[in-house]
């Protein structure tokens, strides 16, 4: 039988929330090049060797996770969901992960560090067993998603929410720690923009996962909940070791562990589940980094007040005249 292809009809809502998330994603859209980073150079030069090393490593770790989420995770989930609008929103989010978030970290590296140091930290990414396990565990769940199989899709969505609402935050901690003290503010501005993106990603995919979960029998729901908690525990135990490996040299590992437990509970909330970890007081400096005067840390806000969008000018014929060797003149 010949397949009938249908077009995306944006004049008709597929559900009561996807177009809202589309609009919010577009309102929040930003580009790495629109944020100047040179203002961080003076602070960076006065940081100790261990502080610089930890900062570089957490950003490199975030780069790996964003790369895999943009290249693998979101595209696979998008492929298996129904609805053109839902696919569009997920594909937009996938684009943000690699083309914007991962590139932003590279822009920070290029501003603050020499090429040799940048190359070293990307080699560290490939050799750090805790970071590699984190990526491998999440990607392996994505790879099990099967066509027309809602259970495997639900599990992939759970992995996605855990990545974006939980695992990223061990990396976000250190930039927020400085940002909350008024240091490395331009880099912190980028982190806040990324966090706001990840917030709506986690909420949106969480809503899609909840739809599938609610359709299951009580027994199947119990099985899926147990599976999700087992995955969370596996990721959490690895995250504790990763945190010690990266943050022990700056004496912040205990604080970071509190922060990741706090965000693990938020990830569970996004999936419609209750908190698993006990409530703890998170370092107020880091919370301050999420609630600075230049920011409204609310994923239903537009771009932060500290964000300056580039001026857009009409194209002129002269814009297409290139003088570089090998270009058309």
Curated annotation (Swiss-Prot):
UniProt remark on cofactor binding: Binds 2 iron ions per subunit.
Gene3D superfamilies: Ribonucleotide Reductase, subunit A (1.10.620.20)
Entry keyword set: Deoxyribonucleotide synthesis, Iron, Metal-binding, Oxidoreductase
GO molecular-function term, one example from the UniProt record: metal ion binding
Residues passing through the membrane, by range: none
Key word Oxidoreductase present: yes
Positions of Fe cation 2 binding: 97, 164, 198, 201
Residues bound to Fe cation 1: 66, 97, 101
Cross-referenced InterPro entries: Ferritin-like_SF (IPR009078), RNR-like (IPR012348), RNR_NrdF-like (IPR026494), RNR_small (IPR033909), RNR_small_AS (IPR030475), RNR_small_fam (IPR000358)
Recorded GO CC terms: ribonucleoside-diphosphate reductase complex
Catalysed reactions, semicolon-separated: a 2'-deoxyribonucleoside 5'-diphosphate + [thioredoxin]-disulfide + H2O = a ribonucleoside 5'-diphosphate + [thioredoxin]-dithiol
The enzyme's E.C. designation: 1.17.4.1
Pfam families named in the record: Ribonuc_red_sm
Residues forming coiled coils: none
Transport is among the record's keywords: no
Active-site residues, record numbering mapped to chain: 105
Cofactor: Fe cation
NCBIfam families membership: PRK09614.1-2, RNR_1b_NrdF
PANTHER family in the cross-refs: RIBONUCLEOSIDE-DIPHOSPHATE REDUCTASE SMALL CHAIN, RIBONUCLEOSIDE-DIPHOSPHATE REDUCTASE SUBUNIT M2
Similarity-based family: Belongs to the ribonucleoside diphosphate reductase small chain family.
Additional remark text: This gene has an intron within which is encoded YosQ, a putative homing endonuclease.
Assembly mode: Tetramer of two alpha and two beta subunits.
Function statement: Provides the precursors necessary for DNA synthesis. Catalyzes the biosynthesis of deoxyribonucleotides from the corresponding ribonucleotides.
Protein name from the UniProt record: SPbeta prophage-derived ribonucleoside-diphosphate reductase subunit beta
